[in-house]
């Protein structure tokens, strides 16, 4: 998924990868993936991921769950609760659910005809909050977000920024 989609230049973003930091994180072994095959293990794996991200050599932990019985709303509520607890500890969690169609505008840079995953899965991405904020600010200054639909920007970047009040 990372090599075949996230790291490749994306025409909708001016041939910049969807995540400009993904290739380096993967190549440096700074990416950890925790697979969940039974949804009742999801909460424990997320907590395990919050421990793994504390390692200074880890940039991102992805908890991927293929047993999707949790709804988009339930996942978002769960992750919000975790963020209230973990953002003060410099840990940020972001949910990605395959059935989430929150955006009013299509997010073309997240759609591809070239590659499809073998199965559907939800993800929880876990990163250091301050490091993510700095990287996001650098990308903003370079114009990276200029091509993002406004509602997608609000649901990702502005949503993360709303947790700043818990950090300091």
Task: Describe each model-derived feature in a short phrase.
Residues 1-168:
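Expand to "…catalyze enediolate/carbanion chemistry for C-C bond making/breaking, isomerization
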């Amino acid at each position: 998924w990372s090599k075949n989609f996230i790291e490749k230049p994306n025409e909708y973003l001016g041939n910049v990868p969807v995540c400009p930091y993904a290739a380096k994180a993967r190549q440096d072994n700074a990416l950890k993936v925790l697979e969940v095959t039974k949804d009742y293990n999801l909460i424990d794996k997320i907590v395990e991921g919050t421990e793994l991200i504390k390692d200074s050599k880890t940039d991102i932990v992805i908890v991927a769950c293929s047993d999707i019985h949790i709804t988009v709303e339930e996942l978002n509520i769960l992750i919000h609760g975790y963020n209230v607890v973990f953002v003060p500890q410099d840990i940020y969690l972001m949910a990605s659910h395959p059935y989430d169609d929150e955006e009013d505008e299509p997010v073309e840079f997240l759609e591809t005809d070239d590659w499809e995953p073998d199965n559907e899965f939800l993800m929880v991405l876990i990163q250091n909050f301050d490091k993510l904020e700095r990287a996001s600010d650098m990308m903003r200054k370079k114009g990276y977000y200029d091509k993002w639909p406004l509602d997608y920007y609000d649901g990702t970047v502005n949503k993360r920024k709303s947790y700043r009040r818990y950090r300091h």
